[in-house]
């Protein structure tokens, strides 16, 4: 969730990033030439910038507020998303409110399509239903949390395996 977490352990910890896996997937999946990476909030700017750098595309940021816990309200979109294919990237999706609201705001500002890449899909409550009924063309989550049953009949949710990343990390640790 945050690189700083490594400081709380008394043993070596490797923080693994799904960004290269997301970039590889996006290059295959998204055919548009007009792409922009989007942070769903100011806190996710570095994550979106990292994916944008790998894809060689620009950056936009959704400025949101939380009027109450569990609720998010989009205030503004920083960056030009008009006629762009937007790729939102985040670390965790729980209730889905932030991502669904961000996607809706991007479409309202002229985005052609909205793709979403999330490392950890908690998908609590009615999150799957929110995503299924949203403007999101495709939401990709990794398999760090088992969501096969929750997502198996949802056309716009895809689960991407990070077993290769985990296996490579373990191999490198055991060989060092």
Where are these regions (language model features)?
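PRPP-associated nucleotide enzymes
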Residues: 1-176
């Amino acid at each position: 969730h945050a690189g700083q977490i490594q400081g709380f352990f008394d043993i070596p910890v490797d923080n693994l990033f799904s960004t290269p896996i997301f970039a590889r997937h996006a290059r295959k999946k998204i055919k548009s030439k007009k792409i922009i990476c989007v942070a769903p909030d100011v806190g996710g700017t570095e994550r979106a910038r990292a994916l944008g750098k790998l894809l060689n595309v620009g950056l936009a940021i959704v400025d949101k507020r939380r009027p109450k816990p569990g609720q998010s309200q989009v205030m503004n979109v920083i960056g030009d998303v008009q006629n762009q294919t937007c790729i939102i990237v985040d670390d965790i999706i729980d209730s889905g409110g932030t991502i669904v609201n961000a996607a809706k705001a991007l479409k309202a500002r002229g985005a052609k399509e909205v793709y979403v890449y999330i490392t950890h899909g908690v998908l609590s409550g009615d999150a799957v239903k929110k995503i299924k009924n949203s403007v999101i063309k495709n939401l990709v989550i990794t398999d760090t949390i088992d969501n096969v049953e929750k997502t198996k009949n949802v056309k716009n949710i895809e689960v991407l395996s990070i077993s290769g990343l985990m296996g490579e990390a373990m191999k490198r640790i055991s060989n060092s």
